[in-house]
Amino acid sequence: MTVTMQYEKDVTVAALDGKRIAVIGYGSQGHAHAQNLRDTGHDVIIGVRAGKSFDKAKEDGFETFEVAEAAKQADVIMILAPDEIQADLYNEEIAPNLEAGNALGFAHGFNVHFEFIKVPADVDVFMCAPKGPGHLVRRTFEEGFGVPALYAVYQDATGNAKHIAMDWAKGVGSARVGLLETTFKEETEEDLFGEQAVLCGGLTALMQAGFEVLTEAGYAPELAYFEVLHEMKLIVDLVYEGGFKKMRQSISNTAEFGDYVSGPRVITDQVKENMKAVLADIQSGKFANDFVNDYKAGRPRMEAYRKEAENLEIEKVGAELRKAMPFVGRNDDDAFKIYN
């Protein structure tokens, strides 16, 4: 199925005008959505539990309330808290304060699609999911453009849910550069698969395996780090800018020939079958239940995984090498660090 890119000209209804908007959470995405919407003239308040984020929201000039009070005051509520706490937050503080005709928004379909959150039939449920971290959503907005976004409607109680989703996307700047309509199911399952099989899980496992092959063969860990991890950004940037074609035009003929010859030897049909198994676990809800159950148990699996990852040789070698490269990491990520 193909989808058509939409832009500001396609947002024909100012569905958020006259609405009081509550952004729940003031982290990476929360601060960006709230500030961008305020800058486009909308009435935005923040709902967040007492702590650093509460103080930061007030410092940034927002009316800031506990979550329940913000939900009570709002017509449109966007939940931008971490996935694992959303269900409790919704059930305890938001659901009791919902009214018929309200709209409830998300930037990721996880809790709605897997039914950890169940919304009354008289409330709109929509999604606006910018395809970038919050600091980028904010920075690009300030520069006059934005980050592309997905939008979706799960429940249209008022007949206005799609207009709300699109106007939200316009308000955060995404309609300046492009919107794609999707569903909660599609966004959730594709997003999780991308993270697990390719972007995060697949990529880190590939780099770790390459590092181990080289060091186990007697090559210096420092050189192995450069070859399988440090240079990854250079290649990914080329692909990001112009696809596989630009990357292959930019590398040596030797590298390009090796790409064609050896890539399929590494990513075999069996690897593809393994990816299908990952997708099946996502589609069935197994991954979602494992993740939520681990959180409810105090995160024993997550903490064990983190501890194991911290002790990998590739991490230790990389930490030492980066000390000699002050230019690495010297960028505009301050906002990301502040809000997380």
Swiss-Prot record:
Cofactor(s) the protein needs: Mg(2+)
Protein name: Ketol-acid reductoisomerase (NADP(+))
Binding site for Mg(2+) 1: D191, E195
Active site: H108
GO biological process, alphabetically ordered: isoleucine biosynthetic process; L-valine biosynthetic process
Magnesium found in the keyword field: yes
Record EC number: 1.1.1.86
Residues annotated as binding substrate: S252
GO terms assigned for molecular function: ketol-acid reductoisomerase activity; magnesium ion binding; NADP binding
Pathway of action: Amino-acid biosynthesis; L-isoleucine biosynthesis; L-isoleucine from 2-oxobutanoate: step 2/4; Amino-acid biosynthesis; L-valine biosynthesis; L-valine from pyruvate: step 2/4
The protein's role, per its UniProt record: Involved in the biosynthesis of branched-chain amino acids (BCAA). Catalyzes an alkyl-migration followed by a ketol-acid reduction of (S)-2-acetolactate (S2AL) to yield (R)-2,3-dihydroxy-isovalerate. In the isomerase reaction, S2AL is rearranged via a Mg-dependent methyl migration to produce 3-hydroxy-3-methyl-2-ketobutyrate (HMKB). In the reductase reaction, this 2-ketoacid undergoes a metal-dependent reduction by NADPH to yield (R)-2,3-dihydroxy-isovalerate.
Domain (KARI N-terminal Rossmann): residue spans on this chain: 1-182
Residue ranges constituting the KARI C-terminal knotted domain according to the UniProt record: 183-328
Family of this protein: Belongs to the ketol-acid reductoisomerase family.
Record note on cofactor: Binds 2 magnesium ions per subunit.
Residues that hold NADP(+) according to the record: Y26, G27, S28, Q29, R49, S53, D83, E84, I85, Q86, G134
